[in-house]
Amino acid sequence: MAAEGSKPVRIGLLGRGTVGAAFAGLLAERADAVEAATGRRPEITGALTRSEGDFEAILAGSDLVVELMGGTEPAREHVLAALRAGKPVVTANKQLLAQHGDELFAVAREAGVQLRFEAAVAAVIPIVRTIQESFGVTEIAKVFGIVNGTTNFILSEMAATGAGYDQVLARAQELGYAEADPSDDVNGADAAAKMAILARLAFHTPVTLSEVAYEGIEAIQPDDLAYAKELGLSLKLLGVAERRDGGVSVRVFPCFLYPGHPLAPIEGAFNAVMVEAPAISEVTMSGPGAGGL
């Protein structure tokens, strides 16, 4: 029950796919803890899917909106409407932010409401808050890491078992680490969108997905992993954002890492992000990076 005299926080949920359903389950499971911490109990008062639900009714009956639809439309339209209606929005939609971040953040500022997006980058790793708060006045030179758990799982399994790409991808799908259509994960687009967001945060400059050079892991063969193993190297799909030649360079590419590199031991469906800043050297954070949440 909500604390006496308090009202529940009414949440309008946009999207009930893998992530949306996992969020709803986790919220129900931890409702008591949220209430104890905030004094208000979270309550999903309406949910919208691509085929069911009334967006206007959900918006009117909510205090905040959680967008987990994926894709750019109709997610963009709904998020803009929520912000203009004065409703704070939480989103995990990295494609939406990478392609339309300028517009969304501008509308949020004009409306005086928050647009939060921690879950859009590197899953459970609190890298967004770390960059915004811990590095608030510290100049960052470089942000790089493993930001896609699906591809890291595939490369790790190929290296450990000698199995081919298609076989390991099927295994990742069985385990829930890869979508039925894994294209954005394996071709590097998902990681590219996340790196565009991190670059914007780290360097305080707009970076769109079209400005990120990226390639994925579809062409990686078992022989590539065997060769790396012989040399004591690890093969990872890395995202890199750094200051270069007076501007910002952002790219995603498969890369061999030497033994002892902080990212070399990151295996399976895990993410890890490193931040380099002259004033503090470097910080590394890691955590689970694929699946429902």
Predicted regions span which residues?
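Rossmann-fold NAD(P)-binding glycine/threonine-rich loop
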Residues: 74-85, 94-132
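N-terminal glycine-/serine-/threonine-rich beta1-alpha1-beta2 phosphate-ribose binding loop
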Residues: 2-87
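Short glycine-rich anion-binding loops that position phosphate/pyrophosphate groups of nucleotides
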Residues: 70-72, 95, 120, 148, ...
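General beta-strand structural signal in soluble alpha/beta enzymes
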Residues: 64-67, 90-92, 115-119, 142-145, ...
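Conserved active-site and cofactor/substrate-binding residues in soluble primary-metabolism enzymes
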Residues: 14, 18, 22, 60, ...
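Rossmann-like NAD(P)H-binding beta-loop-alpha module
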Residues: 109-112, 116-185, 189-190, 197
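ATP-dependent carboxylate/acyl-activation modules
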Residues: 2, 260-293
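Substrate-binding/catalytic subdomain of NAD(P)-dependent oxidoreductase enzymes
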Residues: 167-265, 270-272
